[in-house]
Amino acid sequence: MSVFDDSWLDDRRALEGADPILRRLAEAGARIRRETADASDPISELPGLPRPRAVIAAGSEARFIRAILEPVCPVPFVAWPTHGLPGWVGALDLVVVMASDGARPGLIATVHEAVRRGSQLLIACPRISTIAEHAGSRSTIVLPTATADPLAAAIVMLDGLHELQLGPEVHPSTVADAMDQVAEDCSPFADVSVNPAKDLAMGLAEVQPLVWGGSVLAARASRRLAEALRAASGRAALAADADALLPILEAVAPSDPFADPFEDAVSADRRPCLVLLDDGNTDSLIRSDHTRLVAAAERNDIRVCTIEHWQGSDVERYATLLQTGMFAAVYLSVGLGRTLLS
């Protein structure tokens, strides 16, 4: 079992092994700006298009798009999880496809089906790619991508859907600024004492993370973070709603203040840690769940770690929570002496 060494979080040599993924995280804001600039011309063509009967989204970040659009979209919205399209989709509908990698076979089948049925197709993909070739039709608008960043492509797509009056206004530049701020705050050159991602990594060093996000977007970020923590540590990490996490928290015996940290290392390693992703949502049910989780953790001497960001739009808050968590996962990997692949 790997032992966490917090000195590695400020060790230049140890951090060099994670440089590629840290650099990619730090460049997230720049990727959003590039994708936005490249897609500006096709997005300017969107306001003149007729309102569709329904919107069907497919590809990476389709559920993220749904989380943003569902509360305000004036037409039915479906996030389609598999290849092809529902049988009812036709020429009156808009098919939205995120394919920043450009070549997933299932999405190619979806695009082919949309073109065959004469649906309006709005696709984010590389200009020169297999899927772009299949997307060619009079009813297709391509938002070109070049960075293979699913979130950057999704933010550009949200900008386009706003121009179609199907979603809320999104300011890609402010989302990019938020990403830049996270990169600065969580920089490998920032000391542990002022770096929220390194601080979280230290909090998660010897525990089993139980990750919770109350709002739809925070819950999505919690699932993404749990995936990253599993990859970083090789240990279990669970993201779930409050009703699923409470029985786990309540079943944990309070910690023994007289336990030997060396002799009892195995059992201590398995103690859970409650990780809260708080985007400032003031819904009474969400705040109630937050209170119940914290109270259960405190009763049983369970550590609570929080990532919070209350400023900006829904998309900015989501991006900030997620990106901070991604940096923390990398630092957890560094502290455990593991190689984390991007």
Residue ranges and their predicted role:
Residues G48-E184, D279-G280, T291-R292:
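Glycine-rich phosphate-binding loops that contact phosphosugars or nucleotide phosphates
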Residues R53-G59, E206-G214, C273-D278:
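Short hydrophobic beta-strand segments
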Residues L25, A62-R66, L107, S222, ...:
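Short, highly selective alpha-helical patches that border small-molecule cofactor pockets
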Residues R66-L69, L246-S255, D314-V315, A319-T324:
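N-terminal beta-loop-helix "entrance" segment that forms/cooperates
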Residues F77-G84, A124-P126, R235-P247, R303-G312:
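A generic structural motif
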Residues R66-V78, E227-L238, A295-D301:
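Short helix-loop-beta junction
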Residues M1-D41, S119-R127, I131-T140, T145, ...:
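Phosphate-moiety recognition in structured ligand-binding domains
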Residues R12-R24, G29-E45, A146, H162-V266:
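Active-site phosphate/pyrophosphate-binding segments
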